[in-house]
């Protein structure tokens, strides 16, 4: 998601398949409850929503039909799945749907009429140390920001919902750092955009993530498993 990025950089296995990404994240996190909660906070339409980044478009499954939705991501495979599976197979009907492949930091493309809501879901820890920049620009172009962020991002610390993944995570705790970096590069959180060095510097835990949200003006902070959903509005 960062500027001056090679869009064709190598991505890990789960970032090369929208289906696999959904399958894995649903076993690690309570995805349905998370996105249902975000959609409930957004409420009914008519409203203009900007999803940064949109990932596989999971949020659209739960949005009210009167919502105008704009999703932005750099992962062309995820966007392809949205158009081929989410919109057609699931027959998602929203008032308006715009899906674009572009850098979420291309702020000039978001200027003009304010959005009602910007959703920043599972992105801040990926763009560190530019996470504050992303929030600050979002404040200028939206009336409300909904952020969802895990306070546990290291795979060895995640409380997986699936028994198989619990075993995998347990075994992962004993991998040396050099080997874990290879596993991350090939199979885990390597999005092909943000380096392991950048992502691994994110160190906010349950207490400090909540404090960070408060410092940035977020309120109504609620916990869902290993994640916080927070709201900032004016």
Q: What are the functions of these language-model segments?
A:
Residues 1-19:
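N-terminal, positively charged/glycine-rich alpha-helical extensions of SAM-dependent methyltransferases
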Residues 13-32:
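Class I SAM-dependent methyltransferase Rossmann-like catalytic core
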Residues 28-45:
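Conserved alpha-helix/loop element of class I SAM-dependent methyltransferases that forms part
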Residues 53-55:
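Class I SAM-dependent methyltransferase "Motif I" SAM/SAH-binding loop
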Residues 57-58, 62-97, 101-106:
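Class I SAM-dependent methyltransferase SAM/SAH-binding core
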Residues 119:
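A conserved beta-strand element that flanks and buttresses the S-adenosyl-L-methionine
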Residues 127-138:
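A short, conserved alpha-helix within the catalytic core of class I
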Residues 148-212, 221:
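C-terminal alpha-helical "lid/dimerization" subdomain adjacent to the S-adenosyl-L-methionine
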């Amino acid at each position: 998601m960062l500027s001056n990025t090679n869009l064709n950089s190598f991505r890990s296995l789960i970032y090369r398949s929208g289906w696999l990404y959904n399958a894995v994240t649903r076993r690690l996190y309570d995805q349905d409850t998370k996105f249902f909660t975000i959609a409930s906070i957004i409420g009914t339409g008519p409203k203009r929503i900007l999803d940064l980044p949109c990932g596989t478009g999971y949020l659209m499954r739960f949005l009210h039909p009167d919502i105008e939705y704009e999703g932005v991501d750099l992962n062309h495979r995820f966007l392809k799945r949205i158009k081929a599976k989410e919109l057609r197979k699931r027959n998602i009907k929203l008032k308006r749907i715009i899906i674009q492949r572009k850098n979420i930091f291309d702020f000039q493309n978001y200027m003009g009429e304010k959005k009602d809501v910007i959703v920043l879901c599972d992105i801040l820890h990926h763009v560190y140390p530019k996470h504050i920049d992303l929030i600050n620009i979002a404040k200028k172009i939206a009336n409300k920001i909904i952020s969802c962020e895990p306070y546990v991002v290291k795979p060895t610390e995640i409380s997986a919902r699936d028994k198989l993944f619990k075993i995998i995570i347990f075994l992962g705790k004993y991998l040396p750092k050099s080997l874990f970096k290879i596993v991350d590069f090939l199979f885990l959180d390597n999005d092909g955009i943000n380096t392991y060095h950048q992502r691994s510097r994110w160190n906010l835990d349950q207490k400090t993530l909540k404090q960070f949200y408060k410092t940035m003006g977020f309120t109504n902070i609620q916990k869902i498993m290993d994640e916080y959903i927070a709201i900032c509005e004016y």
